[in-house]
Amino acid sequence: MAKEKAKDDKPAPAASKRILLVDDDAEIIDAMRYALESKGFQIFIARDGNQGLAMAEREDPDLVILDMMMPRRSGFLVLEKLRRTRPVPVRVVMITANEGSRHKAYAEMLGVDDYLRKPFAMDKLIETVQRLLA
């Protein structure tokens, strides 16, 4: 039965991929949402870290785009909890206006998949998302 394929090797189309955006900046959320929806991704939005954790559990996204500095719970705490509580790790891209290399190192230690500094080009974000979800 070598001719039979148990599973299609092609990546799933963007339309089937679910992305959770967690950021307290409405302008950044709107820009990311517009860019990602235009590529066919299904978008969910949380405005703070606690809401982000609740939505991640409820919506089971394929990828989370997470701001580092937010009210109620920082992106670091959200990332740490996502890594501790999910049986299958979700892909996470952390975004930040912070220039410090210590923050990037800490995010990497917590298991972030990629790290983008604000301001970033939407093309760079889309490229990162497509690479991580391929």
Task: Kindly label every feature range from the protein language model.
Residues R33, L77, E99-D114, E127:
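Alpha4 helix (beta4-alpha4-beta5 surface) of REC/receiver domains from two-component response regulators
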Residues D25, M68-M69:
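The short loop immediately C-terminal to the conserved phospho-acceptor aspartate in CheY-like receiver
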Residues I29, P71-R72, G100:
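The feature encodes the CheY-like receiver
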Residues E59-I65:
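Active-site beta3 strand of CheY-like receiver
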Residues F120-Q130:
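C-terminal output helix
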Residues D30-S38:
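Charged docking surfaces used in two-component/phosphorelay signaling
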Residues D48-Q51, S74-V78:
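Acidic catalytic/metal-coordinating carboxylates
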